[in-house]
């Protein structure tokens, strides 16, 4: 099968995406597929006589790509392109994608995950992994997705929204609170705020990455994540951070300070099963298909709360879904192929 792995792009999570993309490329090549790795934003100018066919390879040569702990801004990323243009799709990206049997979306955050890329691929009838345009856009907006979850009686933290050049909203809950960009991921621009003095700087920082920020009530409890592949829930994974909380650095850089436990210790079986069902309920409410990840808080006192859904979960060595799949004996290459085959099966049902 000819597969394009689309990664990078223009997002604060660009570096995470590149790491996921290189790992996915290598994994699918080990399964015998012809794979082309393409950076959404930089594209490929096909210089020196290169052709689109020459970009594909089934030779699994693994490329190490360390995640830079620096969060890139749009200006930083725009400087990577020689011609200075800022359009989302780089040179020849669409032409390359048109030659594939399916595009594996290894994009994270921003325009890579908010439905824009999916919409363009839909226009050209190019198959791709993950959820469709509408579900991607809904889930990328934490505000909209939380409203949908609440409408469907799926527990999630209460919140208010803050905007640039607008008065700070009144909060119907006490400190501490969580401040985050409404459209973002990997905990970029996210803060735990303990008092009024910390609130304004935290909101201002979150608004550097988006024009809308959420102020959420802080839910005290253990943090879990649960992936779903082709309607099958994986075992939950518990995230234990030795110092601080599960921010960008803990997620992708300093893995030694974060402990992942799957299946979780001392999690009642009935709670684990309820978490699996709630993950499916959240996916269905948000319209997610193929694969996704749902994050939770739980304690005996508060019960289960959905934090958010993730339409294109990370696939780096420290990412959660690969670790959950491994518990079931699913190797990383098999996991990637399951995602591809699952999406093709969905498309064939239409």
Curated annotation (Swiss-Prot):
Residues binding Mg(2+) 1, per UniProt: 295, 308
Species this protein is from: Latilactobacillus sakei subsp. sakei (strain 23K)
Entry's family note: Belongs to the D-alanine--D-alanine ligase family.
GO terms of molecular function: ATP binding; D-alanine-D-alanine ligase activity; metal ion binding
Chain positions recorded as ATP binding sites: 172-225
HAMAP family hit by this protein: Dala_Dala_lig
NCBIfam families registered for this protein in UniProt: D_ala_D_alaTIGR, PRK01372.1
Stretches of the chain forming a coiled coil according to its record: none
Positions that bind Mg(2+) 2: 308, 310
Gene3D superfamilies: 3.40.50.20, ATP-grasp fold, A domain, ATP-grasp fold, B domain
Any one biological process term the GO annotation gives: cell wall organization
Cofactor or coenzyme needed: Mg(2+); Mn(2+)
Protein's name according to its UniProt entry: D-alanine--D-alanine ligase
Pathway: Cell wall biogenesis; peptidoglycan biosynthesis
Catalytic activity, as annotated: 2 D-alanine + ATP = D-alanyl-D-alanine + ADP + phosphate + H(+)
UniProt xrefs under Pfam families: Dala_Dala_lig_C, Dala_Dala_lig_N
Ranges for domain ATP-grasp: 146-341
GO cellular component, one term: cytoplasm
Subcellular compartments: Cytoplasm
Main location: cytoplasm
Note describing how the cofactor binds: Binds 2 magnesium or manganese ions per subunit.
Cystine bridges: none
EC numbers: 6.3.2.4
Function of the protein: Cell wall formation.
């Amino acid at each position: 099968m000819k597969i394009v792995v689309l990664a990078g792009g223009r997002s604060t999570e660009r570096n995470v995406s590149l790491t996921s993309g290189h790992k996915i490329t290598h994994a699918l090549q080990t399964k015998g597929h012809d794979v082309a790795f393409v950076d959404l934003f930089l594209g490929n100018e096909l210089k020196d006589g290169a052709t689109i066919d020459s970009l594909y390879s089934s030779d699994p040569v693994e490329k190490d790509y360390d995640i830079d702990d620096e969060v890139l801004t749009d200006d930083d990323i725009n400087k990577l392109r020689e011609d200075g243009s800022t359009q989302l799709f780089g040179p020849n990206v669409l032409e390359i994608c048109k030659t594939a049997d399916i595009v594996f979306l290894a994009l994270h955050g921003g325009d890579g995950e908010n439905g824009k890329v999916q919409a363009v691929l839909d226009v050209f009838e190019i198959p791709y992994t993950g959820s469709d345009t509408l579900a991607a856009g809904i889930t990328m907006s934490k505000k909209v997705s939380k409203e949908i979850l609440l409408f469907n009686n799926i527990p999630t933290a209460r919140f208010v929204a803050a905007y640039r050049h607008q008065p700070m909203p009144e909060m119907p809950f006490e400190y501490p609170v969580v401040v985050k960009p409404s459209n973002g991921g990997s905990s970029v621009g996210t803060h735990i705020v303990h008092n009024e003095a910390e609130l304004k700087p935290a909101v201002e920082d979150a608004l550097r990455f988006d024009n809308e920020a959420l102020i959420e009530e802080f839910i005290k409890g253990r943090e879990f994540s649960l992936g779903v592949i082709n309607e099958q829930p994986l075992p939950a994974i518990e995230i234990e951070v030795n110092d601080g909380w599960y921010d960008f650095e803990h997620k992708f850089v300093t893995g030694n300070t974060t402990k992942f436990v799957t299946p979780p210790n001392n999690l009642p079986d009935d709670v684990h099963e309820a978490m699996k069902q709630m993950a499916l309920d959240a996916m269905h409410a948000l319209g997610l298909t193929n694969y996704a990840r749902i994050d939770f808080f739980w304690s005996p006192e508060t019960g289960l709360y959905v934090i958010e859904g993730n339409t294109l979960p990370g696939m780096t060595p420290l990412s959660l879904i690969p670790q959950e799949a491994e518990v079931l004996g699913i190797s990383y290459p098999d996991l990637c192929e399951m995602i591809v085959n699952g999406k093709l099966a969905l498309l064939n049902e239409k």
